[in-house]
């Protein structure tokens, strides 16, 4: 997530962690689900995962998380509590959607770190599948509760983590500014960090762009224009799966229209732009 990609805009208090389960092809068969970016995973007859399948042999994400993965996390947390009894750190475990959340609280100061642990199957050196719910509208005859989503987190981390290293550019700065603006503007509440990151990946794929710090203002406007176009067209293509997946699929068209209108107002009105660019003294560098 943002912490590992150096895109966090405030102190880190939440992290997502993929917990990789390496079973291999002898225990798991990958099956087409008819939905781009999602698969069905079938346990072989000799697989240890037979306890977590449906009548057709497909691994049920919620069953695996609730009956096995949650137990592993509980045991690990209890072992840590026993080993470090008397510590000022308190650990608690909760269910959080498809993840198991571990809260780590420093009782001496009240600070808390929440870690979402997501069970993940690695089926090849580059293919990872996570237990994340499907929220789209693609027609399919399969049971959505059986779907596993392909994760591109490691590819995204590789692209984003050190992207300013060679030219000391302003890419990270641009994304941090945009994320802060979107968080402060209630109009853009439906835009997630992943939406903003995806627009950036599309924008940054143009190798002709100059990213020296003095270009921050121009890059900001161009990025916002690309985001506006996506909102106005009700379509944001997945960076890795391209046109086969629209990341705005689960956002109502009226909401997208309202966000596009607000974005247009920010881009066309200097006063509105100054109002939203109150970002830790960075306003002048992007005007």
For every predicted segment, state its role.
Residues 1-287:
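Non-catalytic helical "accessory" subdomain of NTase-fold nucleotidyltransferases
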């Amino acid at each position: 997530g943002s912490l590992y990609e150096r895109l966090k805009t405030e102190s880190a208090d939440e992290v997502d962690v993929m917990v990789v389960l390496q079973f291999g092809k002898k225990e798991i068969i990958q099956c087409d689900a008819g939905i781009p970016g999602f698969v069905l995973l079938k346990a072989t007859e000799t697989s240890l995962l037979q306890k977590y399948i449906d009548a057709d042999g497909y691994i049920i994400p919620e069953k695996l998380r609730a009956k096995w993965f949650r137990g592993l996390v509980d045991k690990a947390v209890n072992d840590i509590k026993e080993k470090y009894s008397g510590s000022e750190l308190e650990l608690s475990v909760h269910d959080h959607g498809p993840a198991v959340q571990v809260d780590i609280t420093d009782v001496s100061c009240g600070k808390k770190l929440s870690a979402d642990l997501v069970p993940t199957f690695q089926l090849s050196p580059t293919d990872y599948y996570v237990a994340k719910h499907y929220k789209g509208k693609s027609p399919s005859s399969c049971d959505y509760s059986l779907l596993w989503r392909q994760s591109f987190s490691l590819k995204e981390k590789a692209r984003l983590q050190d992207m300013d290293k060679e030219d000391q550019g302003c890419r990270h700065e641009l994304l941090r500014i945009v994320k802060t603006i979107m968080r402060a503007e209630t109009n853009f509440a439906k835009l997630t960090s992943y939406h903003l990151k995806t627009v950036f990946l599309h924008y940054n794929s143009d190798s002709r762009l100059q990213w020296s710090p003095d270009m921050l203002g121009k890059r900001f406007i161009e990025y916002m224009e690309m985001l506006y176009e996506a909102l106005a067209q009700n379509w944001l293509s997945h960076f890795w799966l391209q046109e086969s997946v629209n990341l705005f699929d689960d956002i109502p068209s009226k909401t997208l229209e309202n966000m596009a209108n607000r974005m247009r107002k920010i881009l066309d009105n200097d006063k509105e732009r100054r109002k939203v660019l109150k970002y830790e003294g960075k306003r002048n560098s992007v005007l």
